[in-house]
Amino acid sequence: AQIKLNSTFRKYSQIPTSKGLTGAQAAAEVARLGGANIVVRQIGGNLTDNFDPRNNTISLSQSVYGNTSIAAVGVAAHEAGHSIQNAQGYLPNKIRSALVPVTQVGSRASIPMIIIGLILPVQYSFIVDIGILLFGLVVLFQFVTLPVELNASRRALKVLDEGGILDGPELIGAQKVLWAAALTYLAASFTALMQLLRLLAISGSRRGNNR
C-alpha cells in the first residue's frame, strides 16, 4: 500500500493544475470554503502533512507546500478536510482525538509489557494482559482513524469540485492520490489487528501450557 501511495503521488506530482494554486494556497482555500479558520505552515520531510486541531494549524511537507501539482493540491486539501471536520464538530474525529493520549501510551508501553510478562513466571501473566489491552487501544485507534480519513478526503474532493479549484480530470487524479493514501491506513489497521490476534494466541497458549 505504501508503494502504491508513493508511485501514485509521484505520478500526479508531475502534473500541474490548471489554476496553478500551490498546496498551501489550496489548503487555505478549501478550509475557507468549508468554514474553517486555519494557519498553514511548512514542515520538513516527505508526506508528513498533518492537521493539528489544538491550534488549527495545517502543516504541509516540502513536496506539498509550494507545489502546484494535482498530488500536492489533493494532499493539502485532505488536511483542510480535517480542519473542516474539526470546525463542524464531526463526532468520529472527536472520538479519535480523545483516543490519542491513551494510544500514545499504548504504542510505547504495550510491547515492552508483553515481553516482560512473557519472561516472568506465569503468575505474572496479568502484565501480558495489560500489555495486550494497551495494544488493543492502538488497534481501536487505527480502525477509528480509517473512516475519519475517508471522510476528510470526501469533504476535500467535494470542496475542490464545487469550489472550482480542480477540473474533472484533475479531480480524478486527486481522488486516486487520496484513495492510495486510504489504502495505507487500511493496511495498517489490518496489520495491527493481525498482530493483536497473534498476541492473544500467544497469551492463551502460554496459559494452556501451564495448567
Kindly give the residue locations of the regions a language model identified.
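Polar-ligand-bearing catalytic/cofactor-coordination segments
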Residues: Q2-G106, L140-R211
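Post-HExxH zinc-binding segment in Zn-dependent metallohydrolases
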Residues: L99-Y124
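Hydrophobic alpha-helical segments of integral membrane proteins
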Residues: I114, P121, F135, A192, ...
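Alpha-helical transmembrane segments of multi-pass membrane proteins
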Residues: G117, L134-T145
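Hydrophobic alpha-helical transmembrane segments
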Residues: Q123-L133
